[in-house]
Amino acid sequence: MKGIILAGGSGTRLHPMTLVMSKQILPVYDKPMIFYPLTTLMLAGIREILIISTPHHMPLFQALLGDGSQWGISLRYAVQPSPNGLAQAYVIGADFVAGSPSCLILGDNIYFGHGLQGLLQQAAALQQGATIFAYHVNDPERYGVVEFDEGMNALSIEEKPAAPKSTWAVTGLYFYDSEVVDIAANLKPSARGEYEITDVNRIYLERGKLKVAVLGRGYAWLDTGTPDSLLEAAEFVRTLEKRQAFKVACPEEVALAMGFISVEEFARIAERAGKGDYGAYLRRLA
């Protein structure tokens, strides 16, 4: 399975912070935002990853992340000239996906919870159909919304409905089989002129090939697209790290745990990791 991180957009809700900086490189407590979706893919066992961003911001991601070899993964890059909807990621990334199943994750989404790795790896094992994740929210009109029957089987999906049929939001994490490229290529723009990922999910639902996994109590899904939500995410991560003395979304640690790099390679990274708390943490692990 291959992964795509969509890290485009202009981040207008975070102006002036994002006037010259990509939203996905802003810090969420002690590390760049993009480390969180990156490590989510790594926890799913995904090692081939495409990062999609704007022409202006692309050099920043390349300087920050490189080719991924330091973490035992392969990173490639592609440009999204203008933000025309989430499903556009599969038009831009068609050659990269090249007939493989894939996972798309939004670059400003953070996931955390006991058992998350198991859910991710289960979804990553799919060969047919699609798996998306639903999360209970207080403001469903801001999201794609999934309607369930009494048995928690998906009945419908709507994008930012004025009158939501449920309080279950579709999160920014999607697992698809190889058919997604053709589905995305044949979409028509929505009323707001975008290629909607909700339309992709709806097609899988109509074909009887959509699984919706519920992230219930004990899971956190954080969207960091506004100043308040960015601060809340940073406070959440800080609390976890201070209370339990571990790092959240540390790619070096995840790479070691997943067997992507050896103990010796990890130790070399830790030696070069600087004098701050992050480097000290890596050296303690080494």
Curated annotation (Swiss-Prot):
Cofactor note: Binds 1 Mg(2+) ion per subunit.
Cofactor(s) the protein needs: Mg(2+)
GO BP field: biosynthetic process
Pfam families found in the cross-reference section: NTP_transferase
Enzyme class: transferase
GO molecular function: glucose-1-phosphate thymidylyltransferase activity; metal ion binding
Record-listed E.C. numbers: 2.7.7.24
The UniProt record lists the keyword Nucleotidyltransferase: yes
Catalytic activity: dTTP + alpha-D-glucose 1-phosphate + H(+) = dTDP-alpha-D-glucose + diphosphate
Keywords, alphabetical: Magnesium, Metal-binding, Nucleotidyltransferase, Plasmid, Transferase
Keyword Cell membrane among UniProt keywords: no
Residue sites binding Mg(2+) per the record: 108, 223
Functional note: Catalyzes the formation of dTDP-glucose, from dTTP and glucose 1-phosphate, as well as its pyrophosphorolysis.
Record text on subunit structure and interactions: Homotetramer.
Record-stated family: Belongs to the glucose-1-phosphate thymidylyltransferase family.
NCBIfam families associated with the record: rmlA
Protein name: Probable glucose-1-phosphate thymidylyltransferase
Species for this entry: Sinorhizobium fredii (strain NBRC 101917 / NGR234)
Gene (name only): rmlA
